[in-house]
Amino acid sequence: MSDIIQDTKARMSKSIDNLSRELANISAGRANSNLLSGVTVDYYGAPTPVQQLASINVPEARLLVISPYDKSSVADIEKAIYAANLGVNPTSDGEVIRITVPALTEERRKELVKNVKKIGEDAKVSIRNIRRDINDQLKKDEKNGDITEDDLRSQTEDVQKATDNSIKEIDQLVEDKEKDIMSV
């Protein structure tokens, strides 16, 4: 298999990995340490991810407990969680921070599903852009005489197969996340 096809699959795989990460950050009404993955704390002047400053535990389905390694950073972590606008209210006793994840209303679930579909659509656009870039490169190579017309046709078909598989995988990820969100 040519380097171009390998490159195509690698780039498409990265897009799917990004989608998976984004979907993991969307809360389905259950506590999940990924909820805080995008939260950075201004710690001694440097933006630092919460995961590096504290251990994050999920003792119950709707409860996150954040135990900072440095107790003096509790207020900073709490402030960063508020600033991240996650739709949760952290409470602190000076030692640990507790976040109770609210149950999702039907309206909020539909809003999240809409957001999931948009993220999935963005991922599909990314995949199609990769396909277009690769096909343009293949046509350029054929025009320059680097590959034959038959090679162009077969590699274009391979790129299309990779695109179809990637879009199928994206659809499956989005569908699974929708089911997760809509299950009460």
Swiss-Prot record:
Keyword field: Cytoplasm, Protein biosynthesis
Q: Where in the cell is it found?
A: Cytoplasm
Cellular component terms (Gene Ontology): cytoplasm
First-listed, main subcellular location of the protein, grouped into a coarse class: cytoplasm
On whether Protein biosynthesis is a keyword of this UniProt record, the answer is: yes
Citing just one GO molecular function, the answer is: ribosomal large subunit binding
Instruction: Tell me its family.
Output: Belongs to the RRF family.
What PANTHER family does its record include? MITOCHONDRIAL RIBOSOME RECYCLING FACTOR PSEUDO 1, RIBOSOME RECYCLING FACTOR
* Record protein name field: Ribosome-recycling factor
Could you tell me which species this protein originates from? Staphylococcus haemolyticus (strain JCSC1435)
